[in-house]
Amino acid sequence: MSEQQPQGAEQALDLNNELQSRREKLAALRENGIAFPNDFRRDTTSDKLHAAYGDKDNEELEALGVEVTVAGRMMTRRIMGKASFVTLQDVGGRIQLYVARDDLAEGVYNEEFKKWDLGDILGARGKLFKTKTGELSIHCTELRLLTKALRPLPDKFHGLADQETRYRQRYLDLIANDESRKTFQVRSQIMAAMRNFMVERGFMEVETPMMQVIPGGASARPFVTHHNALDIDMYLRIAPELYLKRLVVGGFERVFEINRNFRNEGVSPRHNPEFTMMELYMAYADYKDLIELTESLFRTLTQNVLGNTQVQYGDEVFDFGKPFVKLTMTEAIKKYRPETDLADLADMGKAVAIAESIGIKVEKSWGLGRVVTEIFEEVAESHLIQPTFITEYPAEVSPLARRNDVNPEITDRFEFFIGGREIGNGFSELNDAEDQAQRFADQANAKDAGDDEAMFYDEDYVTALEHGLPPTAGLGIGIDRMVMLFTNSHTIRDVILFPAMRPQK
């Protein structure tokens, strides 16, 4: 007898009865003693067993006589009279249990085991063997119920199809979907590998405030909260940049932080209001040094985490083993809109005409640099499929970046693109306190004119710069988007364990 859970309308009809049955079983467990025991200890996991013994035949396993103790969730059960097969799922994967009535303590098989339900958490002890079909299994001599599940598994174990449920009840998604578990395991591996990469290069990991009196470090609308004890409004940080650069002023010459940022903006397949970034700052370096570091970082991560510098994403293959493409912003516009006369991009009137001709609504507050940037985003960004660095961003859209020595209208800045989306942003840092003060003033004027994403004037940060910031370069990398690429995920919600969702009514 193979157990299957009812589907569709039948499942809805039977759910209340099943919930009642499970609660009655729990009540019986309470009457008989400890309903949720915590004295069972496992000594291995399924993945370790498959790795160590998966290639051995049954004769070898019998000769070895390997006894193991495992624990996990019962995903399937096939009862065949006096014996049963169970699929047990743990953090490493799945292992099959062979459960025979005569091998367990008296009464366990009929009075306990057969009354358990799919989804229950079990502990098992026994010896390894191979079935006639060659499946590695555990011949159980002890079997215990560790946790009674009061609700049934979603759609047996073939997957949880409803997207809303996957995001709202991520625990069900992780139980039901192998790919989801794999995605978040890869995410963890990426973050660990990033930390190793940075520490090996002399960077120190630090933590900076998540709540700030003045939000800064990026152009975005912040979340506002109130600090009751201080009786002041505060902001969830939109970026850690200005605090990290204060640390460089203080003498920590190589720092990085991996943490969440918050931006009170729209939700899309690429945007979540709460997201994870790594930011780093390196003294006595410029943006060209960070281009080299970024290329090395991604090549190292793909090789160490995925085992290959080629990454499959949909129909595309991103090759991190080859030198990355490098284009200036205007070169990218010319490449993907060949009819563009580059001289027109230096003329406000002509640049506005180009922007409007491709459907961009030009705001009165925009200067030439903002217009050119909008043109780039419209005509070129989606075409930047292979790993690409775009350089020479206008100073107007780069209020914290150092001006170029030859052309002060542009900055020593780059953005890094893969698959038509921005993954990273880096630049030589502006360390001229007077220039920074003027740019903050320009941003404040833009905010007064209605730009709610313009930066606040941070007087304390200007004071820090007046004490002297060494020549420094900084880089920010969006980890969520990186994980999307590495796991072939097409929405950011698939790589964030608990994404922002509208509350259910």
From Swiss-Prot:
Subcellular location: Cytoplasm
InterPro entries xref list: Aa-tRNA-synt_II (IPR004364), aa-tRNA-synth_II (IPR006195), aa-tRNA-synth_II/BPL/LPL (IPR045864), Lys-tRNA-ligase_II (IPR002313), Lys-tRNA-ligase_II_bac/euk (IPR034762), Lys-tRNA-ligase_II_N (IPR044136), Lys-tRNA-synth_II_C (IPR018149), NA-bd_OB-fold (IPR012340)
EC class: ligase
Catalytic activity: tRNA(Lys) + L-lysine + ATP = L-lysyl-tRNA(Lys) + AMP + diphosphate
Stored SUPFAM superfamilies: Class II aaRS and biotin synthetases, Nucleic acid-binding proteins
Requisite cofactors: Mg(2+)
One Pfam family per UniProt: tRNA-synt_2
Record-level Gene Ontology MF annotations: ATP binding; lysine-tRNA ligase activity; magnesium ion binding; tRNA binding
GO CC terms, sorted: cytosol
Enzyme Commission number(s) from the entry: 6.1.1.6
PANTHER family from the UniProt entry: LYSINE--TRNA LIGASE, CHLOROPLASTIC_MITOCHONDRIAL, LYSYL-TRNA SYNTHETASE
Cross-referenced NCBIfam families: lysS_bact, PRK00484.1, PRK12445.1
Family of this protein: Belongs to the class-II aminoacyl-tRNA synthetase family.
Name of this protein: Lysine--tRNA ligase
Species, as recorded: Serratia proteamaculans (strain 568)
Lineage of source species: Bacteria, Pseudomonadati, Pseudomonadota, Gammaproteobacteria, Enterobacterales
Gene symbol of the encoding locus: lysS
